[in-house]
Regions:
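Short S/T/G/P-rich N-terminal loop/turn motif that feeds into the first structured element of a domain
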Residues: 1-64, 73-91
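Short, non-transmembrane amphipathic alpha-helical segments
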Residues: 66-68
Length: 91
């Protein structure tokens, strides 16, 4: 069942996001990722992703590569919420 990841990074910058994304968006690393969007906030940013399953999210966010990329960028650790998805529409 698809799942949604919502990661809020209070105090993070878009430069930090770009730096971490450069490492995290390499082909093959994000197996199961269907959609990704980054939304600027007044004090940080939010990443909204749709994945093939909650397990795919856990595999990604629990990986050494994920933890290392976040730490190397200098951004605060994201507050991550995961929820099941009822319906996905792509156009």
């Amino acid at each position: 069942m698809p799942a949604q990841l919502i990661a809020t990074v209070n105090g993070g910058t878009l430069d930090q996001y770009d730096q971490a994304s450069e490492k995290l968006m390499k082909p093959g690393f994000q197996a199961g990722l269907l959609h990704h969007a980054c939304v600027p906030l007044d004090d940080g940013f939010m990443v909204i992703e749709t994945w093939e399953s909650e397990q795919a999210i856990q595999d990604f966010t629990g990986s050494e590569q994920f933890q290392s990329a976040i730490a190397a960028s200098g951004m605060p650790m994201p507050d991550i919420q995961v929820r099941p998805v009822h319906n996905v529409v792509s156009k």
